[in-house]
């Protein structure tokens, strides 16, 4: 079911609030990708919700992002807006707070990192990256995807 809201309405920023405010069930919700305009599949909609990504509003209509465009945009943003990289201790020194209390997302899929993923960066001495003014790392899934060795 398509959704539209007036420009002065308080537009919900996440999928669950969008469903609640419009009375549309999650399974009936239809969003298009803000980048390529294709309709998100049910799986992409679920992933969008689980990654806690914000709904984007254009001309009174809500948009999400498909899996392919999220990956492409993540790579493009990293290449275009990378500022510098630090180990966990450097990030904590710069921000004056533990990474455990900071919102750090995966630079590939944009999922918020959980404590175990942040701990892995610390324990395995992997760098976090400052991209577009925000600290980014790798989630468990993207970490393994980026470290796969190609057999010779």
Curated annotation (Swiss-Prot):
SUPFAM superfamilies: E6 C-terminal domain-like. One of its GO terms (biological process) is symbiont-mediated suppression of host innate immune response. Keywords: Activator, DNA-binding, Early protein, Host cytoplasm, Host nucleus, Host-virus interaction, Inhibition of host innate immune response by virus, Metal-binding, Modulation of host cell apoptosis by virus, Transcription, Transcription regulation, Viral immunoevasion, Zinc, Zinc-finger. One of its GO terms (molecular function) is zinc ion binding. A zinc finger (unnamed) spans 33-69, 106-142. It is found in: Host cytoplasm; Host nucleus. Plays a major role in the induction and maintenance of cellular transformation. E6 associates with host UBE3A/E6-AP ubiquitin-protein ligase and modulates its activity. Sequesters tumor suppressor TP53 in the host cytoplasm and modulates its activity by interacting with host EP300 that results in the reduction of TP53 acetylation and activation. In turn, apoptosis induced by DNA damage is inhibited. E6 also protects host keratinocytes from apoptosis by mediating the degradation of host BAK1. May also inhibit host immune response. Belongs to the low risk human alphapapillomavirus family. The cancer-causing human papillomavirus E6 protein has a unique carboxy terminal PDZ domain containing substrate but low risk E6s do not possess this domain. This is Protein E6.
